[in-house]
Amino acid sequence: ENGEPLGIFRENALELVYSKALTPDKESFKKMIHEACKALNSYGVTSAQTDDFVAFPQVDYEVLIAAYQELEKEGKLTVKINQQAQLVNIEDLKEFIGKGYKTGVGSDYFKIGPLKLIGDGSLGARTAYMTQPYNDDDSTCGIPIYTQEQLDEMVEYAHKNGMHVVIHCIGDKIMYMVVEAMEKALKKYPKEDHRHGIVHCQITTKELLDKFKELKLHAYIQSIFLDYDINIVEDRIGKERAKYTYNFKTLMDSGVITSN
């Protein structure tokens, strides 16, 4: 602020921190995964979705894939894993698909799931990307991670190469951008059961809710966010916009496939 560092890192600036973090090796990954499986099994959980590829950005994703595959061969992967492939740019996506990976590739216990993208930030940090400025800070509309052109390119490439696409969207502006990218891809390469979707779907509009049904998008709603964000939503975006937040029942009643 005013040219002075505050010690706060937001969105892409976090790469400066991640790049200095310790780098686990494959055996360390195997130990962490095995311990996580045991914890999940203790609660009766037998399948999970995860997006591990950028948990340690300095580690090649094939090291992580190998860790899962070796655990499966050893009989220690006791939770069925669907790996949401978080790849941050078009170059990484092209390389990934070029190596033969896409949605559905794998075994009964470890499969590649959808391409996972992070579209914006969070409501609490005012980094969710909004069409209008924040109610309690009119100097910002939040932070988009991608431009429209970048989203268009990545969504189209994944779609035409057999990958489902799921994108984290909190704010309404980023949701408009993502819906536009998905609509363009579907018009260019029509596919009935595409299974593309939006994660969180927090701050919507009637137009966006209608688009979910029209394009047959899935909604990954994650209602646990209500525990925190419901207490700040009116402060952040005002009462009028708050009417179109967490409209999960509306989505379900309209026939949109939702999951938690």
Language-model features, listed with the residues they occupy:
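Short amphipathic alpha-helices and their capping/turn segments at secondary-structure boundaries
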Residues: 1-3, 93-115, 204-216
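Divalent metal-binding segments
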Residues: 1-98, 113, 117, 122-174, ...
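Active-site environment of divalent metal-dependent phosphoester hydrolases
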Residues: 54-57, 171-176, 203-206, 226-228
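Extracellular/periplasmic catalytic domains that process cell-envelope and extracellular macromolecules
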Residues: 74-76, 103-109, 190, 251-253
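Structural detector of well-ordered beta-strand residues that form the stable sheet scaffold
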Residues: 82, 166, 197-199, 218-220, ...
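Polar interaction faces of repeat-based domains
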Residues: 180-190
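Aromatic- and carboxylate-enriched substrate-binding clefts and catalytic-loop regions
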Residues: 194-205
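Active-site-adjacent C-terminal substructures of enzyme catalytic domains
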Residues: 203-260
